From Swiss-Prot:
Organism: Arabidopsis thaliana
Matching CDD domains: B3_DNA
Record lineage: Eukaryota, Viridiplantae, Streptophyta, Embryophyta, Tracheophyta
Protein name: Putative B3 domain-containing protein At5g35780
GO molecular function list: DNA binding
Subcellular location: Nucleus
Chief subcellular location: nucleus
Annotated segments matching region Disordered: 112-149
Keyword Cell inner membrane assigned: no
Length: 307
């Protein structure tokens, strides 16, 4: 009788241990599943687009366009100072090649203006893409107007050495920018149209570019768009504009064909989607002289603005 009781007790103990083991396995599997969901969630967050991280200001003329879905409430967030933590963090560090930023900047204090015998003076993938863009835009303007497209006048600039301002290097170090030489691409005196709130854009004519090799092939493809397409499928390239006080704004950079009453048209780049906030934040007015430089921060195109 005693042996029978001990046997039952042993069976009960074994059953309890098996039950505990099963519970432990279930708990471990649940924890692993939660970790997997967390990893997937992080990957999905890292894949979100530039315009999700830097929401643009909704304009009334753009309400019906598809990209309003990125900001359905129409809230204006472009006026806020951008947080560097919002910039894409999953940029490939192997290609970034920026272990020590101070060393690559030594000796990079100068850039040269080129004689613009042709706006596309550099034979690169980006300039060839720009040439294709110009041909398409010319055809689009010609279809809307019977007149001929006005040819860009060649502007010959004196060959001179321009020293990069020290504040540009300081901003690059502050933003932990990619190790590359900052490039001066544009200088101009602002007109009334550049600071008019109803237009909210900075016009950058092709023929006034100092250099045009600052776009990647992917960015060239992103700004290609048929001007007759009302859907505006191309939303341009997301960029960051930064001033001398390291204050930043998220803007859109794209191509724009400007028509004239004569039937002629010109091709330009524009910076918009928040340009009014840049004007207010820097106190810009007609007659001010500005300079635009370029560099990249984790692959994102950045424009230092000197006033």
């Amino acid at each position: 009788m005693t042996m029978y009781d001990l046997t039952d007790s042993g069976k009960d103990m074994c059953s309890s241990l098996c039950l505990l083991a099963e519970v432990a396995v279930m708990v471990a599997e649940e924890e692993q599943f939660r970790r997997l969901l967390k990893t997937v969630s992080k990957e999905e967050d890292s894949d979100k687009s530039f315009f999700y991280r830097f929401p643009r200001k909704i304009r009334s003329s753009l309400v019906k366009r598809r990209y309003t879905q990125q900001n359905p409430n129409g809230a204006s967030t472009s006026s806020a100072v951008l947080d560097l933590n919002l910039i894409t963090t999953d940029y490939d560090l192997k290609t970034q090649q920026n272990p020590s930023f101070d060393e690559p900047l030594v000796g990079l204090g100068k850039t040269e203006k080129k004689n613009l015998t042709n706006p596309n003076y550099q034979s690169s993938s980006s300039s060839s893409c720009l040439t294709e863009n110009k041909s398409r835009k010319r055809r689009a303007v010609q279809q809307r107007k019977s007149g001929k497209l006005k040819k860009a006048r060649v502007v010959s600039l004196p060959r001179m050495s321009i020293e990069t301002p020290e504040w540009v290097f300081q901003v690059m170090r502050y933003m932990n920018a990619d190790a590359e030489t900052p490039r001066l691409i544009f200088e101009r005196t602002l007109f009334n149209s550049d600071v008019k709130s109803g237009l909210s854009r900075l016009l950058i004519p092709f023929q006034q570019l100092i250099r045009n090799d600052f776009l990647t092939p992917a960015e060239c493809r992103a700004i290609q768009k048929d001007e007759d397409n009302e859907d505006d499928k191309n939303i341009g390239v997301g960029t960051i504009l930064v001033n001398q006080r390291s204050k930043m704004w998220g803007l859109r950079f794209k191509i724009w064909a400007m028509e004239k009453d004569s039937g002629h048209g010109t091709l330009n780049y524009i910076l918009n989607w928040g340009w009014n906030d840049v004007v207010k934040g820097n106190g810009l007015k007609a007659g001010d002289n500005i300079s635009l430089w370029t560099f990249r921060c984790r692959g994102v195109l950045c424009f230092p603005l000197e006033t």
